[in-house]
Each structure stands twice: as structure tokens, then as C-alpha cells.
Amino acid sequence: MKFFIDTANLDEIRAAESLGVLDGVTTNPSLIAKIVEDPASFTRKDFMDHIKRICEIVDGPVNAEVTTLDAASMVREGEELAAIHNNVVVKCPLTIDGLKAIRSLSEKGIRTNATLVFSPNQALLAAKAGAGYVSPFVGRLDDISTDGMALVGQIVEIYDNYGLMTEVIVASIRHPQHVVESALIGADIATIPYSVIRQLANHPLTDAGLKKFMEDAAVIKK
């Protein structure tokens, strides 16, 4: 399973990249907003430049989301994003217009990610429209007392049934168990906040064992 980092923070991306486990990046307007110090002066060019900087850090897919709602505007914006770097993947929301944009962009050879997916029906439509990736949001489903990981399992099964090549990106990950369950289900990718990536490496028995080893290492002459 591939690991993407779900952030627009350059320091977090660099830190994750230094671990040697990073395969790509996902961003969205909310994540971009978190890193903007002065929203009043942040321009479209600033946004495009930021995506370019991410592409310079990570040698893998960098997902950037459109900020328009009608199909024609999404296509136009998607073409602009794709022109930034060969690694850019254009995220489009799973709406009727989003499906039209995904189809059009895919026909132009531009990779797409159908985002804000919350049902198997939406995921099937995304694959049929030509999306390279589909992003079910598990945490947001959990928030409304629905089993988000069950949706991932359904999508993986449906895609396997018909040999659909759309890759499943498990999104809205909240904790390490989401990552484990994604791997067990057979999802292609988990996109993970940096805080959760760090949690994946932690275990109290590792800490206890290391403490004991270091105490015992005192007998080794320096």
C-alpha cells in the first residue's frame, strides 16, 4: 500500500519525505487555507506556486483540487493545474459536473481524483467516468456513526469484481487504526496527516525496550 501525506504544509511534507516512506501528497482548499498567513493577499498565482513547490519536494503524485463547481470551469482550472508539473493530479468533487469534468480531463490525458466520495455508487461512477483515483472519506463517515472502512471494503470489492483500474485513496484518516484497516482491506493508498504518520512509528513496548537497552549499554566501553 502506498502512503500519501494529507497536508499542504511544506515542512510536514519535507519531514515525511525524509523518512523514506512517502509516495505522494494530497491537498484540498481547507489544507491550503491552514498554511496561508494573510488570506487577503493570497492570490491564484501564490496557490499555483505552492503546488509547484510541493512537486519539487516529492517525486510522486501531488493532488490539487479545483475550486469551481461547473464542469467547464473545472476543466479549465484542471488544465491550469496539470500544466504546473507532470505529477499533478486534479481533484474534482463527485458531483454531476465533477463527473463531466473528470471525463473531459481524462480524455485529455490529465490524471484525476474523484474526491468527497461517500457511497459505493459514487465510487462506481468515478471509475466509469475515467478517474485515476477515488477518495472515500472514512473519518467524516465515522463522525456521523457510519462505518467508513466498510465503504472502502465495498469499493475495493466492486473494483476487483470488474477489473476497474481506478486506485482507492483512503482519505479523512484520523488515527493509525484507519491505516491498518486500509492495508488489510487492500486499498491502494492511504493519505495520512503528518501527526498520524508519526504515530505509526510509536509503540510503548518499543520505548520501554529502548530504555532498557540503553541502560544496559552502559556496560559497553565507549
UniProtKB/Swiss-Prot annotation:
Disulfide bonds: none annotated. Pathway: Carbohydrate degradation; pentose phosphate pathway; D-glyceraldehyde 3-phosphate and beta-D-fructose 6-phosphate from D-ribose 5-phosphate and D-xylulose 5-phosphate (non-oxidative stage): step 2/3. This is Probable transaldolase. The gene is tal. It is found in: Cytoplasm. Transaldolase is important for the balance of metabolites in the pentose-phosphate pathway. It comes from the Bacteria. GO terms for biological process: carbohydrate metabolic process; pentose-phosphate shunt. Its EC number is 2.2.1.2. Its main location: cytoplasm. It comes from Chlorobium luteolum (strain DSM 273 / BCRC 81028 / 2530) (Pelodictyon luteolum). The active site is at 91 (schiff-base intermediate with substrate). It is an enzyme of class 2 (transferase). Signal peptide: none annotated.
